[in-house]
Amino acid sequence: MDYFTAIGGVAMFTLIIMSFVAIILAARSRLVSSGDVTIHINDNPDNDVVTPAGGKLLQTLASEGIFLSSACGGGGTCAQCRCRVIEGGGSILPTEEGYFTQGEIRNHMRLACQVAVKQDMKIEIDPEFFDVQKWECEVISNDNVATFIKELVLKIPEGEEVNFRAGGYVQLEAPPHEVHYKDFDIAEEYQDDWNNFGIFKYVSKVDEPVIRAYSMANYPDEKGLIKFNIRIASPPPRGPDGIPPGKMSSWTFSLKPGDKVTVSGPYGEFFAKKTEAEMIFVGGGAGMAPMRSHIFDQLKRLNSDRKISFWYGARSIREMFYVEDYDQLEADFANFQWHVALSDPQPEDNWTGYTGFIHNVLLEEYLKGHPNPEDCEYYMCGPPMMNAAVIDMLHSLGVEDENIMLDDFGG
């Protein structure tokens, strides 16, 4: 091989490499957006957002102070960040299709967390999202109210206010963290159960920020605070090894007075109808939260004269909470009654009230003798199996879906 042949080979090789680089750069320029784009929102120029291209629509809007609901934090699993992308969003992705009907797809409905911001866009969102705010709150208290449920109470920053409707929710943001269950402050009366189920052994290690939605237990006239009922999502005691504990619930159970928590909201759709129909509330477990918010709001703020009853299912007396609050409401308001059914009362409970599952008790003790159960409004929140059982029972009585309101936190 002579000198000129070698030089020619090197030159040819270099040319090939440079051609590949040029092709890659050209492709990148087409696939990876750069520069600023304009997002036109709700056909109102005052809402226009000019922002760098390249992110997802959910996070892009959040960076501009527009917080769409997203209980999964943008993972594409909660389907709460629904919006209408009229122009500039490309074709709907397979990860989105299962959350929409064909009619909704034709109407350009999308999940904001799945839509890439590559070019100018025209979108429509619920106007209420413009009122969503974000606060850094402080933990006031975080005490057990039942074996596996804590009441977390947060203080709103001075001068701020959460303008929410009863039945609404907010999103909590947890930073990356590692929490050890053995460090939790668990009330002494509940520690035996935690030890018997081996719960103190768990560790929750989370490497990325987590966002989850929680219904508020307070009602609008309880100012300056936000109150939650949060159940620990520990692995099932007889489940296979390796199931991780719940990311957000583990973190919230570790919180102590003075700790800071980032909250955004308010959001919601689990609102009371403005009618005169009888209201029947059905709850279980941590589903107590929106029940309390609604019932207190109807009676103490609105002074409603609607007939209202609350049916709550618990395992035993140790799992009952807010008992004094509801007893007082029943004493103060002639139009309100509340009932508890225990599914597994303990001998020491000396329980003489209703027993069994709450949907059966509601049916046998009240709805079977009700002249028009189909005319009542039903508001429910509880474990998925409870919700399904109540809905099936109501359907069997001829209650239409429009009269069944569900806060499906476990669905």
Swiss-Prot record:
Cited SUPFAM superfamilies: 2Fe-2S ferredoxin-like, Ferredoxin reductase-like, C-terminal NADP-linked domain, Riboflavin synthase domain-like
Return one Gene Ontology term, BP aspect.
sodium ion transport
Cofactor dependence: [2Fe-2S] cluster; FAD
EC number in record: 7.2.1.1
> Which Gene Ontology molecular function entries are recorded, alphabetically?
2 iron, 2 sulfur cluster binding; electron transfer activity; metal ion binding; oxidoreductase activity, acting on NAD(P)H, quinone or similar compound as acceptor
Assembly description: Composed of six subunits; NqrA, NqrB, NqrC, NqrD, NqrE and NqrF.
Q: Which family does it belong to?
A: Belongs to the NqrF family.
Kindly provide the name given to this protein in its UniProt entry. Answer: Na(+)-translocating NADH-quinone reductase subunit F
This protein's encoding gene = nqrF
